[in-house]
């Protein structure tokens, strides 16, 4: 049985977040938390919070054993993009894209 947790509208691009998500896919939760704790990426903090939420959901709602959990699925989808304007020289302007993402983490028990 899989238990999931989601973080929607995270203020980070999906491309940057997927770099960290790919590292923890399939790992036991203890190793995944350890890897995320010592990572220097901003995405690692966000994914670690979602992973801790999924672990808490599994333990509290379904009574699963925390020691036997592993990260079965983790994926990052693009959220809405805010478009902003930045003034440049000689009356020109550039568009700034403020990207967001939706992070989903699923954990399951190993048999």
From Swiss-Prot:
Keyword Membrane: no
Keyword terms of this UniProt record: Ribonucleoprotein, Ribosomal protein, RNA-binding, rRNA-binding
Entry's Gene Ontology BP terms: translation
Molecular function in Gene Ontology: rRNA binding; structural constituent of ribosome
RNA-binding found in the keyword field: yes
Pfam families: Ribosomal_L22 (PF00237)
Annotated disulfide bonds: none
A GO CC annotation given for this chain: cytosolic large ribosomal subunit
Similarity-based family: Belongs to the universal ribosomal protein uL22 family.
HAMAP family assigned to the protein according to its UniProt record, in alphabetical order: Ribosomal_uL22_B
Assembly: Part of the 50S ribosomal subunit.
Function: This protein binds specifically to 23S rRNA; its binding is stimulated by other ribosomal proteins, e.g. L4, L17, and L20. It is important during the early stages of 50S assembly. It makes multiple contacts with different domains of the 23S rRNA in the assembled 50S subunit and ribosome.
Protein name from the UniProt record: Large ribosomal subunit protein uL22
The species this protein was found in: Francisella philomiragia subsp. philomiragia (strain ATCC 25017 / CCUG 19701 / FSC 153 / O#319-036)
Gene designation per UniProt: rplV
């Amino acid at each position: 049985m899989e238990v999931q947790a989601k973080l929607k509208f995270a203020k980070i691009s999906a491309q940057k977040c997927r770099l960290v998500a790919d590292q923890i896919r399939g790992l036991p939760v203890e190793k995944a938390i350890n890897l995320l704790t010592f990572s220097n990426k901003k995405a690692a903090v966000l994914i670690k919070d979602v992973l801790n939420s999924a672990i808490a959901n599994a333990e509290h709602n379904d009574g699963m054993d925390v020691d036997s959990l592993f990260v079965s699925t983790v994926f990052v989808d693009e959220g809405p993009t805010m478009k902003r304007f930045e003034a440049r020289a000689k009356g020109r302007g550039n568009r700034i894209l403020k990207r967001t993402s939706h992070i989903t983490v699923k954990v399951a028990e190993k048999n």
